[in-house]
From Swiss-Prot:
Tissue/organ expression: Expressed in leaves, roots, stems, young plantlets, flowers and siliques. Highest levels in ovules, embryos, shoot apical meristems and first leaves. Also expressed in somatic embryos.
Family: Belongs to the histone deacetylase HD2 family.
Domain of life, source organism: Eukaryota
Polar residues bias spans: 208-234
GO MF annotations in UniProt: histone deacetylase activity; hydrolase activity; zinc ion binding
Region spans: Disordered: 99-245
Phosphoserine: residues carrying this PTM: S211
One Gene Ontology cellular component: nucleolus
Biased composition (Acidic residues): 103-113, 137-162
Compartments where found: Nucleus, Nucleolus
Protein's name in the database: Histone deacetylase HDT1
Amino acid sequence: MEFWGIEVKSGKPVTVTPEEGILIHVSQASLGECKNKKGEFVPLHVKVGNQNLVLGTLSTENIPQLFCDLVFDKEFELSHTWGKGSVYFVGYKTPNIEPQGYSEEEEEEEEEVPAGNAAKAVAKPKAKPAEVKPAVDDEEDESDSDGMDEDDSDGEDSEEEEPTPKKPASSKKRANETTPKAPVSAKKAKVAVTPQKTDEKKKGGKAANQSPKSASQVSCGSCKKTFNSGNALESHNKAKHAAAK
């Protein structure tokens, strides 16, 4: 850092050209010696390129100086409208240190980049690399999924076993089946028994009827065949033996 200062006389603007790689910081402007203090106002002007700006206004009575913070890296011009004295501008000079890894060429390249490419360049850093989970997490996920499958299978088994409460109804049926039926009345028992007796009688009657038939069998004298009735024997004799005679 190096002190810098300049005197600007009445009606004589001063042009200041910073050295290459140097910045000029203007921090204060003040009026010179003034014999007549009647509250006269003194505007201060600064011109940079084609722009002529008012830096501030001093007063011989109330505002003999003002503080500012202006930095110039190229040629500029200072002036004022006070015709009774000089105005002094002071400040300091510092080297124009550019950030490391950054130059004017890079700045020009960035300005030439199209807006679309700039948007892509901005969008790319947003993409985050996919996080790789450790194998332990995979095993835990598998165990969790197995646990879920077991829970699902248990849920299905429980759902399949839910219809079992219907068993009490079947037990009631079994209870009804096992319970002894009401005793059958004597009349019904007799009615149920009598058909058996009649069947036995029928069977017995047939057997009795068959025995006389077997006793009344007749045999043919010529061929010694037996017949159950005489009519059968007669028809046999007519058919067999009468034709032979």
